[in-house]
Amino acid sequence: NSLLSGGSTQYGTFTWSDTVKDTIPTVGTYSYKVVFTPSADTEKNYETISTTEQDVSLTVNAKSLNDARVTVSGSYTYTGQAQIPAADAVTVQLDGETIPKDRYTISASDNTNAGQATVTVTGKGDYTGTASGTFIIGKATPNPTIPTELNAVYGSTLKDVLLPKGWAWDTPDSSVGNVGEKPFAATYTEDNRGNYNTVQKDLT
């Protein structure tokens, strides 16, 4: 919204002309018509005073997004690649209004590994400045090959039964027990454990 003030030495009011009063100005400097309407007292005291229309120059500056609130919807899981939320997933609000998506660009940082990532919007067109929000990249769940055909000797413990890389018995000191097939809990952990969940399985 634009506020109009006048510098005339005569008493009266300034208003936007009917031809431009509903115009929403964009960033830049433009000419708009303004109407000066003298008050009743002014008309009595000045014979030549009448309603006057004049072009005035109006400069509209871009609005800063620095205080905007940025939120990100959706879920994100580690893929090994940098992830930038789509425009539809990003909402920017300023002074209670949602900023149109074509008024800013979107970038992200710390957005490859699992954990908290940052999304930054940069104003363009009618907006300037930047604002940031966060989103979470969750750990991925691996799909390891499940060890099979494991064999143990009576009287031994689980730690005597070797497992493929990444797998470990949950209770390595436990006895394998009597002869026969039995399940024992084991956990698979990726080398890049910060980005992957562990996988637990009962192995036989």
Residues of each region from the PLM?
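Solvent-exposed beta-strand/loop surfaces, strongest in extracytoplasmic domains of secreted
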Residues: 1-204
